[in-house]
Amino acid sequence: TSVGFISNIKGMKNTIIFDLDGTLALIDKRREVSTKPNGKLDWGKFFNSTNIKLDEPNLPVIKMAQLFSEQGFNIVILSGRSNKTETATRSWLSKNKVPFNKLIMRNSETDHFTPDWVLKKNMLDENLDINDVFLVVDDRDRVVKLWRSLGLTTFQVAEGNF
């Protein structure tokens, strides 16, 4: 027997949301080079385009995105990264074969200090139809809690108490 495309089921939701840092991208090396002697993160270094290249691909999560994309789902990446890093981010996504239909990033002019869970809710409200979201994949506890409070099935791919 053959298995048909799961997304061909009538009335099925068709959008899958992925977080980027800590979910699709493993950021340990970038965090290491961006940490000040006092232990605090230097956000300028952390979001420096050169340092973004240090990120490692989270292969199981990227494979999940590839499989869903092959099945016809819309892949949307919601990221707390500044839109000033969009070129470096798109380059990293391409190099690591991460499929996506839409990349939505933090507006560096208006959202600089917006907490990520508020930012992601705003991104959802302004850019997507919540009724079309099939699944969310994220790592951060506060953001996972937001998605689940909205009734969205959410896979948490890493410890996210930060």
Question: Could you say what each language-model-derived stretch is?
Answer:
Residues P57-V61, W117-K120, R140:
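Amphipathic coiled-coil/heptad-repeat helices and related helical stalk/stem segments
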Residues T87, D111-V118, K145-L146:
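Short, solvent-exposed polar/charged micro-motifs at secondary-structure junctions
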Residues L124, N131-F162:
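Acidic, Mg2+-coordinating phosphoryl-transfer loop and its flanking beta/alpha structural elements
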Residues S108-P115, G160-F162:
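A short acidic, often aromatic-flanked loop/helix-cap motif at beta-alpha or helix-coil junctions
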Residues P115-L128:
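Short loop-to-alpha-helix "cap/lid" segments that border enzyme active sites
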Residues G11-D111:
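Alpha-helical substrate-recognition element adjacent to the catalytic core
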